[in-house]
């Protein structure tokens, strides 16, 4: 299993909206950056993703699971970009803010800090566990 982080503006798509769609999940679409799209293509069924609220809040708020691997999304008329389908797994007990992530020296190299504009990024197992621990404080 691999771990990822997905960014969404909560006024466009929030963790609460993800929860409301239930186990059928929802398409994670609209990704038009090539590096982010390539990350979507690497996802496998069962991979887990942190759900990050960008712009408003700037914090990791929950976890979703990949339930369908990359496919060309019908809204992409040029057939260049992909989407995956994800379902809600859980909200974090305590959201983990970008500010607190930046303060943790063990997280200094994660893409959320190094490539702040990237909307889909891998998270290594060590960082995944650190962030989960931070969420339980």
Tell where the protein language model's regions lie, with residue ranges.
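Short, charged, solvent-exposed linker or helix-capping segments at domain edges/interfaces
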Residues: 17, 95-101, 132-134
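Short, charged beta-turn/beta-strand-edge "cap" motif at the junction between a beta-strand
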Residues: 52-58
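Aromatic- and Lys/Arg-enriched surface recognition patch
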Residues: 61-121
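Loop/turn positions that initiate beta-strands
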Residues: 46-47
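Short acidic/glycine-rich loop or secondary-structure boundary segments that cap or lie
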Residues: 14-16, 58-60, 74
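Charged phosphate-binding loop/patch that engages nucleotide di/tri-phosphates or the phosphate backbone
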Residues: 120-137
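Short, acidic Gly/Pro/Ser/Thr-rich loop/turn segments
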Residues: 11-13, 93, 130
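Compositionally biased, charged N-terminal/linker segments
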Residues: 1-43, 135-137
């Amino acid at each position: 299993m691999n771990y990822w982080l997905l960014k969404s503006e909560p006024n466009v798509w929030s963790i609460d909206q993800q929860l409301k769609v239930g186990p059928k999940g929802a398409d994670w679409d609209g990704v038009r950056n090539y590096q982010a799209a390539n990350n979507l293509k690497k996802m496998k069924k069962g991979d887990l993703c942190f759900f990050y609220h960008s712009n408003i809040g700037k914090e990791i708020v929950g976890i979703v699971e990949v339930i369908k691997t990359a496919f060309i999304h019908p809204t992409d008329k040029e057939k260049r970009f992909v989407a995956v389908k994800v379902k809600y797994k859980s909200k974090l007990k305590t959201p983990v803010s970008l500010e607190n992530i930046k303060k943790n020296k063990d997280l200094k190299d994660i893409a959320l800090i190094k490539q702040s504009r990237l909307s889909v990024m891998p998270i290594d197992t060590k960082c995944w566990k650190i962030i989960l621990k931070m969420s339980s404080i």
